[in-house]
Amino acid sequence: MKRLKVMTVVGTRPEIIRLSALIQKLEASPSIEHVLVHTGQNYDYELNEVFFKDFNLRRPDFMLNAATGTAIETIGHILIKIDPVLDEVKPDAFLVLGDTNSCLCAIAAKKKRIPIFHMEAGNRCFDQRVPEETNRKIVDHIADINLTYSDIAREYLLREGLPPDRIIKTGSPMLEVLNSRRDDIAKSRILDTLALTPEQYFVVS
């Protein structure tokens, strides 16, 4: 039986964390051949390696090392470097998450008519000065399937004219990520280290 070839692209540490549980499922599925690509948008693999190890992820199949001087140069390098990878791998499906510059590699996949799945689709801040707002709109509108976290994100896409059959509400993958780390969280001594009282603090990022 022919396995479905799925390519997942990451480029930043938040993407690695959010996609970690899904990547593990894709890797474990006997019906899927999973190909992992790291664009190196912000950091090279060595500076991201701790996250791959912490979440029990293998080394990516392709390292694009696309980071360069300006954001525009980085985007250009990402598109140039993903192009031959797509030709070599010929994936059946292409998965990206969020609104980083790395997500714009979906443009190359679209040109090659590879089905695009966009997780965290439909998020909007309604501030055109924010570069990520442009990124997420581009990817939302070229994606074949938009995977939203919430009803309001789905509503935003519908208002922008996307058909309902291209939108699926999945919720956030962070629940699965946190559940997979439950034992490690329970063993953590970070509250003692920071002298914090349980349930008497909050985190701002």
Give residue ranges: language-model regions.
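Phosphate-coordination loops involved in phosphoryl transfer and adenosine-cofactor binding
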Residues: 3, 91, 199-200
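Short, well-ordered coil/turn elements that cap or connect secondary structure elements
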Residues: 1, 29-31, 58-59, 111, ...
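Active-site and donor-binding regions of nucleotide-sugar-utilizing enzymes
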Residues: 7-10, 16-25, 51, 63-163
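A nucleotide-sugar donor-handling region in carbohydrate enzymes
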Residues: 42-46, 142-205
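Structural beta-sheet core signal
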Residues: 8, 36-38, 96, 118, ...
